């Protein structure tokens, strides 16, 4: 099988610096040696525009960005201004994928009114993004307050926002007690990017301050692990996605990893093994 490009979250690079005591440049070059050359970046991290040259000097580019919005509650003018400035910054870095975290529905909200407003702002963002050749995406965000945390929720947005695409986070459907494999079958036609996230129930995956566990909707605690080291079934999902024609980046994600560099290395090794 063809080996897709590998991306890693920039936050993991920074976490690895704190864990290892190494400089950012040293960690990036170590990640490069594992096979990564893309970065998934929280947009605010890119406000210092000198990062573009720094990343390039280390052998990296920005493969995707993500940013949080509150489309369901913010004033329309404010949302549009934030959309425009966000897209301009993403375009400066050459990012072609933009994951919009569109906001949440709270207990006392008029749920349908908030979702309708989200759809309107996402439609505007998709239209604006076309000017830069950027694809706007939603993901299966692992929070019950996100109306796009489930397969059915995502299907609603995909069907009601023309041109909106899907970032398939392989590990987030587990939060909602849904099967990632079944989600892939239903949403495959919308996928434009993949976050390769695995989950583990193994408490040995806890970090030093026991802050990296996340409860699924049943209350069971999930821990981050290297891609391919947990129970999600990463190998089968990724093999099928590539066989079905997915040729984009595989973005390794394991926020809160007890040892970010080790997990990056193991994730890259596993993905190369799966796609031999």
Please annotate each region the language model reported.
Residues 8-12, 41-45, 64-69, 100-102, ...:
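A cross-domain feature marking catalytic cores of carbohydrate-active enzymes
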Residues 1-96, 163-165, 201, 268-276:
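N-terminal pre-domain/capping segments
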Residues 57, 65, 127-231:
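Acidic/histidine-rich catalytic cores of soluble enzymes
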Residues 67-83, 102-115, 217-221:
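Surface-exposed, active-site-proximal loop segments in enzymatic domains
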Residues 90-111, 135-142, 251-252:
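Active-site groove signature of glycoside hydrolases
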Residues 38, 97, 193, 248-249:
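Residues at the N-termini of beta-strands
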Residues 24-28, 48-52, 83-87, 119-126, ...:
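Generic structural signal for well-ordered alpha-helices
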Residues 15-20, 38-51, 70-79, 106-109, ...:
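Acidic-and-aromatic substrate-binding clefts and catalytic sites of carbohydrate-active enzymes
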């Amino acid at each position: 099988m063809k080996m897709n490009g590998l991306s890693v979250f920039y936050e993991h690079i920074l976490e690895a610096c704190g864990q290892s005591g190494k400089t950012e440049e040293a960690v990036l070059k170590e990640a490069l040696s594992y096979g990564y050359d893309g970065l998934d970046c929280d947009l605010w991290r890119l406000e210092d525009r000198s990062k573009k040259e720094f990343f390039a000097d280390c052998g990296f580019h920005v493969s995707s960005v993500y940013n949080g919005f509150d489309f369901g509650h913010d004033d329309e003018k404010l949302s549009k201004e934030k959309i425009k400035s966000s897209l301009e910054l993403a375009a400066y870095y050459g990012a072609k994928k933009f994951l919009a975290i569109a906001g949440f529905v709270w207990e006392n909200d008029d749920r349908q009114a908030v979702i309708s407003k989200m759809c309107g702002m996402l439609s505007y963002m998709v239209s604006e993004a076309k000017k830069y050749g950027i694809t706007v995406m939603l993901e299966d965000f692992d929070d019950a307050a996100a109306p796009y945390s489930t397969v059915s929720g995502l299907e609603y947005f995909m069907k009601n926002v023309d041109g909106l695409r899907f970032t398939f986070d392989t590990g987030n459907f587990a939060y909602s007690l849904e099967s990632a494999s079944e989600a892939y079958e239903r949403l495959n036609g919308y996928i434009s990017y993949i976050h390769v996230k695995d989950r583990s129930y193994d408490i040995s995956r806890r970090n030093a301050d026991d802050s990296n566990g996340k409860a699924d909707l049943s209350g069971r605690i999930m821990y981050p692990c290297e891609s391919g080291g947990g129970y999600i079934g990463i190998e089968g999902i990724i093999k099928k996605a590539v066989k079905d024609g997915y040729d984009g980046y595989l973005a390794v994600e394991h926020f809160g990893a007890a040892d970010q560099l080790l997990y990056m290395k193991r994730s890259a090794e596993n993905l190369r093994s799966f796609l031999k």
